[in-house]
Amino acid sequence: VEELLPSEEDEVLMYRMTEKILNEYGYDKYEISNYAKPGFESRHNLGYWSHIPYLGVGLNASSYLDEKRFENPSDMKDYLEIQSFGDAYEGARSLSVYEQMEEFMFLGLRKTKGISKKEFIERFGCSMDSVYGKQLIESMKQGMMKEEGDRVFLTQDGICLLYTSDA
């Protein structure tokens, strides 16, 4: 099976060729693996990556409200049983502040615009550097991330590493 899969170098080459072709046809990359013509970006995806609360309705749906994750059952019988008791979901899990920070970072770094240091402070009451300073510095030294003004984001090499690492 492995001989059927492209090498990591070939994956990066295909990724960069795809990006070049899409750019030539007017598509912009707004997330590490999503392209759209300006104004046609997925609002759902951008909301998810921006850590905006959302409500999922129906079988196997998930929601994120008030820093909690909610999940509906994937089995129809279980779903109908829960609904008959007046419950709207199977389980809820509150995220710790650290888990919220982690999600803010890894979801936000998927966007080509990256993440705002100011927004991190407003959301969590501490600086991004105080929590992730060592990792940020090391990633920047390795050329995987960069900082411009208030924003931190992945470089092209950082995107390729993330894209090829099954992250």
Predicted feature descriptions by range:
Residues E41-N45, Q142-G143, C160:
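Short secondary-structure transition/capping segments
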Residues Y163-A167:
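Conserved small/polar residues in nucleotide/adenosyl-binding loops
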